Design a protein with these regions (language model features):
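Hinge/cleft segment of the Venus flytrap/periplasmic-binding protein
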Residues: 40, 47-49, 179, 183-187, ...
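Hydrophobic alpha-helical
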Residues: 95, 102-128, 195, 213-278
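Hydrophobic alpha-helical segments within soluble ligand-binding/sensing domains
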Residues: 45, 51, 94, 150-176, ...
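Extracytoplasmic "Venus flytrap"
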Residues: 50-70, 74-78, 84-100, 112-117, ...
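Short, low-complexity disordered leader/linker segments with a strong preference
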Residues: 1-50, 76-77, 124-131, 331, ...
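Flexible loop/hinge segments that line or gate small-molecule binding clefts
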Residues: 117-157, 273-281, 327
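Short beta-strand elements at the ligand-binding edges of bilobed clamshell
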Residues: 85-87, 142-165, 178-180, 210, ...
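Short, solvent-exposed amphipathic alpha-helices that sit
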Residues: 62-81, 158-162, 186-205, 223, ...
Length: 339
């Protein structure tokens, strides 16, 4: 009798085990996994979201290094993405990279354009292929219907804020060495435009020289050294990024020309690298204009909306930015805003 009962019990346990093994997957507890999925933008079929990211060379500047690092930290497999990156400071090479990403059938194309023009055709190709385009960092000259959103800096405002600050210094005359970034980029156009307008409108604003150093410190140093060697007088360095300002200062130091607060030459830069803000804090530079490189979280939020069938709340997001004056900057500013 005991043997019969034991046999019946064993059969019952086996039957119960089989029933558990055949239980449908969708009946398992899902609350925790659902919460996690809402945080990471997985595609509707559960696959990773394929993203092609076109950016400028990370070695271009401290700003670009921070921007690239921010993007790489966000667009990971852990966050639901399969991301590929392409880098160039040349528009034609970036456009070729975009065409390659279209052929690779990415889901999203993220672009920080080297130049503002020439993008219409490739964006039309992306649209025809059903690929969503998101601009970051810089604007382009293209119809807004060709991209779903843009998260960018207002480069014209950056330039105007800097020029307004310079005008507030009340110099009798402004003799300016203007060191430009890569010509045709949104950053160069915006930061140059405000200064050009101010020089054109005021007789006591003079452009001693205006040349591109293409964001490069060594080239900027050569430009300033050439002006020093020519014997032309100047009292302002307006450099369109921190690295070029650093190169300009190297030429001043070599020639024993004082610079900074209360000195012979006003030094201005853009990007707010931490080391540059420390130069302001020490009084060696006078002004630095912020350019916020941290766009990745905004892009991620937009992609989440699109994956959930929602239209982004804003077509264009302008990054919050400010300018810093050596006479008012604090260590807290350096710690909070330095990149």
């Amino acid at each position: 009798m005991k043997k019969i009962l034991a046999l019946l019990l064993a059969i019952t346990m086996i039957a119960a085990f089989c029933a558990c093994a055949q239980k449908p997957a969708d009946t398992t507890p899902a609350d925790t996994s659902a919460d996690t999925a809402s945080d990471a933008p997985a595609a509707s079929d559960g696959k990773l979201i394929k993203v092609g990211i076109i950016n400028n060379d990370p070695n271009e500047s401290g700003y670009r290094t921070a921007n690239d690092k921010d993007l790489k930290a966000m667009f990971t497999e852990e966050n639901g993405y399969d991301a590929s990156f392409a880098y160039s400071l040349k528009n034609d090479e970036q456009i070729a990279a975009a065409q390659k990403f279209i052929q690779d059938e990415v889901d999203y194309l993220l672009i920080s354009a080297a130049g503002t023009s020439g993008w219409d055709s490739v964006l039309q190709d992306a649209q025809a292929a059903g690929i969503q385009v998101i601009l970051f960092d810089r604007t382009i000259d293209a119809d807004e219907s060709l991209y779903v959103a843009s998260i960018v800096s207002d480069m014209a405002k950056e330039g105007q804020t800097a020029v307004d600050w310079l005008a507030s210094q009340g110099l009798d005359s402004y003799n300016i060495i203007h060191i430009q970034g890569v010509m045709g980029s949104a950053a160069q156009i915006g930061r140059t435009g405000a200064l050009d307008a101010q020089v054109a409108a005021n007789d006591n604003w003079n452009m001693v020289t205006q040349q591109t150093a293409e964001w490069n410190a060594e080239t900027a140093q050569q430009i300033v050294q050439s002006v020093i060697d020519s014997g032309k007088e100047f009292n302002v360095i307006y450099a369109e990024n921190d690295d070029m300002a650093k190169g300009a200062v190297a030429a001043l130091d070599k020639a024993n020309i004082s610079h900074g607060v209360g000195k012979d030459v006003i030094v201005m830069g853009f990007d707010c690298n931490k080391w540059a803000l420390e130069e302001l804090l020490a009084g060696n530079w006078n002004y630095d204009g912020q350019c916020n490189p941290f766009q990745a979280s905004y892009i991620d939020a937009i992609i989440k909306d699109l994956e959930n069938g929602k239209t982004p709340a804003e077509k264009t997001i302008i990054m919050d930015e400010k300018g810093f004056d050596a006479s008012t900057i604090t260590q807290e500013d350096v710690d909070n805003y330095g990149i």
